[in-house]
Amino acid sequence: MVEPNETWLIIDGYEDEPAAFGVPPYVGFHVRYICGVLEKRNIEYEYCTIDSFRINSPSLENRSGIVVLAGAVVPGKYLRGTPISLNETRDIISNTPRETPILCGGWAIRGWRHQGWNPLQSNLFLALQDTDATLDHYLDSNTWKHQRRNSDQWTQWAHLGAASKAVTDNPDLHGPLTYEVEVYQGCVRYKRGCKFCIEPKKGVPIWRSPEDITQEVKIAHDMGVEHVRLGGMTDTYTYMADGVVELEYPIPNPEPIAKLLHLSLIHI
C-alpha cells in the first residue's frame, strides 16, 4: 500500500477525442478522474499542464510516481495549447529516475503503442484501459494491471476530480476555462460505427444519470468554474435513448436531456 504522504506528479498532456475536448481552454475529464483517485486516498500530488511543463518544468526527482496523460487523437490546430508529443513523452520517461513508477495513459498512448512504440523499463506501464482505475489498482497492490472503472468509481472520481488540482491549479481557472463533463461513453453505432472513429471501440453506451452530472457540475462551480461543456457524447439526442441495443436508430428520450439543459451556462 502506498503511504498517503507521498507526492505524485500528474502531467496533463491533454485529450482530444471525437466526443471529448481537453485541450485548453478545456480541462478534460480523464485527467480529473486520475486526480480524483489521489484525492480519494489523500495522497499528495502536483498537477501540471504540458504547456506549463514546457515553460517551467517541475522536478521529476524524488517523486513517488508520475502519471502522463496523452489523449489527443484528433488532428487539429489549437489556439491556446499544444498536446504532448511522443518525443516529449519519451523525454519525460528518460529523465525520470528508473526507480520511479511511471503510468502513461490515454488514446494517444494506445495509438503510439499500436504503431510500435513499446519502451522497455521495469517500472513503466502503458495503460490500455482506464488510466484512473489502473492507477487505483497500483496504489492498492503495488502491481500494474489494465483495469476498467466501475460505475461507483466513475461517480466518485468524477466528483472528487471536480474539486481537484486539475481544476483549482488550472492556469485558465479565472479566465476562459471550460469544464468538460463526460455525460456518457461509447456510441450507439458500436456495431457499425465509423471506421476512422475511436468511439465505437468503447462499446455499448454507458450513461451517467442527470443527477450525478448535476452534482459534479455544482462541485466544479463551487471551485470557481464558470463554463461547462456537456461532452463525451457522440450524439446529444441518443443520451439515455430507448432501444440502443435493439434498434438501428434509437428513439430519443427528451426528459433526461432537458434536465441537463437546465444548467446555467453550458456548451454542447
Task: Give, region by region, the residue ranges found by the protein language model.
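Conserved small/polar residues in nucleotide/adenosyl-binding loops
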Residues: 266-268
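Conserved alpha-helical substructure of the radical SAM core
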Residues: 200-232, 246-262
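Short, Lys/Arg-enriched charge-dense amphipathic segments
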Residues: 68-76, 128-130, 234-236, 249-261
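A solvent-exposed, charged loop/short amphipathic helix patch at secondary-structure junctions
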Residues: 78-87, 197-198, 241-258
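Flexible glycine/acidic-rich beta-alpha junction loops that bind and position SAM and/or redox cofactors
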Residues: 18, 75-77, 111-113, 229-246
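Acidic, low-complexity intrinsically disordered segments
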Residues: 1-212
